[in-house]
């Protein structure tokens, strides 16, 4: 019934198996990939005809994690998987980015790749084999995909690279880098690092590319056994149409792309487009030399050809800058008066308002995944409204792009955050992109770094970021610093680098063409370093380090420790004691299982009051010490006094006074304040108190002899 085919190899100490022919046989391509006990199912399906009028490549990648993969049941009312999690969205993007450029130019048939995690061993993350599976499924499907690609994760510890580190090894690693590529080219890099040098980062990319080669060979071997016949697709030849457009408006486009202001430039490009349409499309009565669909495609190609050629010939950019020149920067801290920390970061026509908000442990984000529920103390949310590019559009929840850009900035800043024990606040960053013309994610890095310093978050060092680009034609190339949006679209590489003066904290690279060598990547990294240092200098005009104190608008906080055996005393039966502390002081109190108590309030007085009450509860009463207490109940044989936090003790009637009394009510009533001395504990551990040895006016101890004589009456 099944025609199973598989390949296996030992890869970084574990067995990788890719199998096809048993599951999802109606998909054009389907593989099961296993690494350790982590298993994914990857499928690829493509439409055999393009939709009429389709003018872009409709590739969709969906990565999904099933809770059953790790033996868990989803939370919530419906108890089933819901909208994509951040992890699923980021992994979908991770798969999309290296495979998209490898489809044949002009292919506009709908393609859908679905990768599902079916088993998760809590050691091997599924994202790497998800990439491998997507690549294998596409190769087997017969789609015009110029793969396969491989992928690998690289860690770094004690000066050594670690290929495909486990989850536990990643926690100790200074680097988490994912690289994907073909046999001879790197296509995508995504990373988070602990201020590592450019050489170490480049070495990690090379190490990962070398490590994935056996996987690429395995996919090719499987394809030789099980691949479908290649889909008959002939890329359209638009060379004559392209030449017609360039001959007609090439000079106009070259002139338009030298205009610095984005709005004026787009107006000039629009005029050139209208001129070309009039000359080449003709009318209904007299058709022109090409169809509107072909014109739309080749006009974009003409733009790219003109811009790329001008940059390589003249060494000058679209807006007149030199290759390594950064746009003018204006950085301002404390931009908004009532926020905890804020900044306005403007670089050319890209601008971000970044805001820091500090909260308590109550504000931590709970993240539910295959490995359980985790709490995150640092959040960064990136918003890209349509007005930032002068357009109208849908306003709603964060899309894939916004989630991806936010996570890139999150990775860039994570390395410089203070340890939680030194700064126990939950931090939420928000970046509102108010203008965009390239590199808004790196503006977010710079702006959020300033906003956190403005809020008083003690970052180890400021972080800046820069987006690099590349124009590559044969052996000629130009590396561009601080690229514009147009340079991103028309270029061959989008290379984002963020870091401090000490090293790189995040690196993201997307390459659209083969042929980018290690030397070119090295030059781009080195040029990016110079740009980052320049940007740090401009940021330093606003703030060079965190402010010495927190914003007056932020909550104040203090952490204390209590013995673990005292936690139940602080909480009380049904939370009665801790609620009483909160109600009486106005402070928020959170206590962890290890005895860490987080106390926060808007004023210091409330915090001090809460600390005093907690210490009163957890401190140990000492025999022989004198305490002030309150009468809480009266019996015939004596009174019970609350004298040390929640502690009550008995003052026997014989210990109330240096004279004989018949009933406690002759001396006190409930609610009276009295002074007592802790005499000790009885055989059952009950507290024994005495009033008669203490002067009830002053709280001073009376002479022992007087007390002893009176007790013998």
UniProtKB/Swiss-Prot annotation:
E.C. designation(s): 2.7.7.8
InterPro entries, per database record: ExoRNase_PH_dom1, ExoRNase_PH_dom2, ExoRNase_PH_dom2_sf, KH_dom, KH_dom_type_1, KH_dom_type_1_sf, NA-bd_OB-fold, PNPase
Residues of the KH domain: 555-614
Annotated Mg(2+) binding sites: 488, 494
Top enzyme class: transferase
Swiss-Prot/TrEMBL cofactor(s): Mg(2+)
S1 motif domain residues: 624-692
Entry keywords, A to Z: Cytoplasm, Magnesium, Metal-binding, Nucleotidyltransferase, RNA-binding, Transferase
Record GO cellular component, one term: cytosol
Organism domain of life: Bacteria
Catalytic activity: RNA(n+1) + phosphate = RNA(n) + a ribonucleoside 5'-diphosphate
GO MF annotations, alphabetized: 3'-5'-RNA exonuclease activity; magnesium ion binding; polyribonucleotide nucleotidyltransferase activity; RNA binding
Subcellular location(s) per record: Cytoplasm
GO BP: any one term: mRNA catabolic process
Annotated family: Belongs to the polyribonucleotide nucleotidyltransferase family.
Function, as annotated: Involved in mRNA degradation. Catalyzes the phosphorolysis of single-stranded polyribonucleotides processively in the 3'- to 5'-direction.
HAMAP family in UniProt: PNPase
Protein name: Polyribonucleotide nucleotidyltransferase
Native source organism of the sequence: Hyphomonas neptunium (strain ATCC 15444)
